[in-house]
Swiss-Prot record:
Keywords: Isomerase, tRNA processing. The active site is at residue 39. CDD domains: PseudoU_synth_EcTruB. HAMAP family: TruB_bact. It is an enzyme of class 5 (isomerase). PANTHER family: PSEUDOURIDYLATE SYNTHASE TRUB1, TRNA-PSEUDOURIDINE SYNTHASE. It catalyses: uridine(55) in tRNA = pseudouridine(55) in tRNA. The gene is truB. This is tRNA pseudouridine synthase B. Its EC number is 5.4.99.25. Responsible for synthesis of pseudouridine from uracil-55 in the psi GC loop of transfer RNAs. Belongs to the pseudouridine synthase TruB family. Type 1 subfamily. It comes from the Bacteria. GO terms for biological process: mRNA pseudouridine synthesis; tRNA pseudouridine synthesis.
Length: 305
């Protein structure tokens, strides 16, 4: 039985569910879950939690992501990416903008921004996914969502050809960010229709491309009984949370029994959630949270016996 976090390289054409389904067959275990959907046409890092690590999948999802995308100015599509039908076209030429214009524009997207999710997305409105409305040619008001663009920058020269302009960007962002919507919004600010023509996720939850394995590589390692060495411990998925190392055996026992604590029993300031780590084994004991009605207390959220 495997336990840990496995960074998978999801190839284009597969859904995130496809990856989990195939892994369950390869590893012969049902206790597998991914840490956030990647669209079928997007390649890149998809951390997968296996065994007891499935309990920390939400925390891996919260740790942020990084992408490399190609923005195409001059044509917009129904899906905001290269898979959709053309909505609008407007010829773009090198006289319209240059590298400096794009760099200044990208700076304006840094920080907390508002996005309207694309119609072809899994965001739910009135209990129904937006892509279900889109497939039925129904329109529905899409709620604006705040997302965090931690960093964004151009990583290629502008390529003007066939009345369009293409350039690559690198984006570091929080969860829930739609890069294809970012591409179309860049176009709006330039005064042109636009779409995202290619996307690769280069980092997710602290895992990067060089750590990621294809399904074929995973199958080979499993058959050679050497896959466990490639898995990251579940503690890795909690590195986005503050932690306290526990030495006292009595305190360890209380934590593992799920007892409440007063905040002032610990030297560290506890603002929201805290991870307790066994000082001897370096293993996680539990995740605690501030009590919802008693601010001076913390209570267990997840205990790892």
């Amino acid at each position: 039985m495997y336990n840990g976090i496995l960074p998978v390289y999801k190839e284009r054409g597969l859904t995130s569910h496809d990856v989990v389904f195939k892994l369950r067959k390869i590893l012969k275990t049902k206790k597998i879950g991914h840490t956030g959907t990647l669209d079928p046409e997007v390649a890149g890092v998809l951390p997968v939690c296996i065994g007891n690590a499935t309990r920390v999948s939400d925390y891996v999802m919260d740790m942020g992501k990084a992408y490399e995308a190609t923005v195409s100015i001059g044509r917009s599509t129904t899906t905001e990416d290269q898979t959709g039908d053309t909505l609008e076209m407007k010829g773009v030429h090198s006289a319209n903008f240059n590298n400096d214009d794009i760099d200044r524009l990208l700076e304006s997207f840094k920080g907390i921004i508002e996005q309207i999710p694309p119609m072809y997305s899994s965001v739910k409105v009135n209990g129904k996914k937006l892509y279900e409305y889109a497939r039925n040619n129904e329109t529905v008001e899409r709620p604006k969502r705040k997302v965090n663009i931690k960093d964004i920058g151009r990583i290629s020269e502008l390529d003007f050809k066939e009345n369009e302009c293409h350039f690559k960007i690198r984006v570091i962002c929080g969860k829930g960010t739609y890069i294809r919507t970012l591409a179309t919004d860049i176009g709006v600010k330039l005064g042109f229709p636009a779409h995202m023509s290619k996307l690769t996720r280069i980092e997710s939850g602290g895992f990067v491309l060089k750590d990621s394995l294809t399904l074929e590589q995973i199958k080979e390692l499993h058959e050679q009984d050497s896959l466990q060495n490639k898995l990251f411990p579940l503690e890795y998925g909690l590195k986005g949370l503050p932690s306290i190392k526990i030495k006292d055996s009595h305190i360890k026992k209380r934590i593992l029994n799920g007892q409440k604590f007063n905040k002032n029993e610990f030297d560290n300031k506890i603002k929201d959630q805290i991870v307790f780590i066994d000082d001897d084994s370096e293993k996680v004991l539990a995740i605690y949270m501030v009590h919802p009605t008693k601010e001076s207390e913390i209570k267990p959220k997840k205990v790892f016996n």
